[in-house]
Amino acid sequence: MTPPVSIKRTTGQNISRLISRFVIGTCIVGLLAMWIYAFGFASKESVNKIGDQKWTARAEEICSKAEEQRLALVDLRQISDAGVNALTERAALIDKATDTLDNAVNEISAISPTDEKGKAIVPLWIADYKTLIQDRRDYANQLRTGVNASFSESMFEGLPISEKISTFAADNRMTSCKVPIDLSI
């Protein structure tokens, strides 16, 4: 039996191995610290969550009523089956559905939340909703001209504004206040 051959490393190789081990060890410790912070110490509260639960309950109730009004307007006919005035009729339905949103947003905005965070971010949410409402009105006007294009909405930092609106609504448990999907079908 022959003894194992020992390989002598140069000082440069030893230093290189030591540095590599140090860098890998530091990365492992850093990742471990990040996950411990994320699961143990980081805030679990959403950045959109406001403290005034009475305000959110009131907003949810208003949005729920508006949603019921929109559901009563549903027209499941195909555009091709609706006749020569199909686009004009669809535009009128969109206007009525948008009116329910507009009325709900105006009613919600009549009373401000009582907490500081709510006072700061709810007006931004209302402004975003008003932008979406204007997008819907512009789309209805486009349909009246005979152009049957897909609905497109304003973008905010690369995302549709509806994503921002619906995220705020979901984070505050106001599911009826999410953007309706009636124009995205």
Q: Which role fits each region the language model picked out?
A:
Residues 54-140, 150-185:
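Alpha-helical segments in soluble extracytoplasmic regions
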Residues 142-146:
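Membrane-helix boundary connector in multi-pass membrane proteins
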Residues 38-57:
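Ser/Thr/Pro/Gly-rich low-complexity linker/stalk segments immediately outside membranes or between
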Residues 3-6, 38, 132:
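Short, functional N-terminal and low-complexity linear motifs
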